[in-house]
Amino acid sequence: MAARTRETGNTATVAETAVKQVQIDGMVVLKIIKHYQEEGHGSEVVQGVLLGLVVDDRLEITNCFPFPQHTEDDVDFDEVQYQMEMMRSLRHVNIDHLHVGWYQSTFYGTFVSRALLDSQFSYQHAIEESVVLIYDPIKTGQGSLSLKAYRLTPKLMEVCKEKDFSAEGLKKANIAFEDMFEEVPIIIKNSHLINVLAWELDKKAPVTEKHELLNLSSSNHLEKSLQLLMDRVDELSQDIVKYNTYLRNISKQQQQKHQYTQRRQQENLQRQSRGETSLPEEDVNKLFKPPVPPSRMDSLLIAGQINTYIQHIKEFTSQNLGKLFMAEAMQDPTI
């Protein structure tokens, strides 16, 4: 587990505060971007391991390494063994080798899924300070680095531990799609030498005469985001239909139980009036097995992904609307 220390003189004591900030070395950001550029294609997801340490309530990510791309046919590949060998090699060259989380690329903001939930729960259950970094290459390609850190909320961690994803379980935990993930602020830190080099390169960069401030973003981004949003809404609608079918089956079964109980009572009254022995009471639940309640976690995840798409569309449209108003004002001859 990542070491969590609090500097008090020359002693280190265990701190119980949660991770409130993520500090990432610039080299780690470049390695994540490079990993996607080399192995990511379209909607294909790339993943990797984050290494670092925890100081007070700050998680410092100092290194990372990628998961190699492999298919189901690669039966000889052992992912756990690969991670252990990589961390052992890093330890031999005196590089931070403490496991503090993982990273994953996303396609138009698509990352809220059961696979990510299960993976992050496994990481966070084993290593309390773990985070997952979500890198969006589409937004980054438009000139704005998109890298966010997420953790599962304590509420969702408890639900995953109990493994009760029924409607009653989620209601008891008082959890909604807004309560699944918590975003942790990110700070990108470079060494002084890298900052000096970046300053020198910026001075040497040629000055372009083109002003791209008012250029509108590609409409393909909005079109694709809306298409993905509609697909998730359709999935949520189908999931709601399945749950409503389950509720109807429950109601129908309750009516059948009630009718069976009434018939048995009437039959026993008739037998008693004829002086015959009453029929024994039977366990109604054995005769009418209740239908298996569907998991509501998938609906929760779909709702969370819908919310993510909406936030991306809102951000995209607000930026373009601002550019449109600025362009209109600049064309006004009275100004």
UniProtKB/Swiss-Prot annotation:
Gene Ontology cellular component list: eukaryotic 43S preinitiation complex; eukaryotic 48S preinitiation complex; eukaryotic translation initiation factor 3 complex
Compositionally biased region (Low complexity): 254-263
Entry annotated with the keyword Isomerase: no
PROSITE patterns (UniProt xref): MPN
Superkingdom field: Eukaryota
Pfam families in the record: eIF3h_C, JAB
Region feature Disordered, mapped onto this chain: 254-287
Family to which this protein belongs: Belongs to the eIF-3 subunit H family.
Subunit structure: Component of the eukaryotic translation initiation factor 3 (eIF-3) complex, which is composed of 13 subunits: eif3a, eif3b, eif3c, eif3d, eif3e, eif3f, eif3g, eif3h, eif3i, eif3j, eif3k, eif3l and eif3m.
Protein name: Eukaryotic translation initiation factor 3 subunit H
Organism lineage string: Eukaryota, Metazoa, Chordata, Craniata, Vertebrata
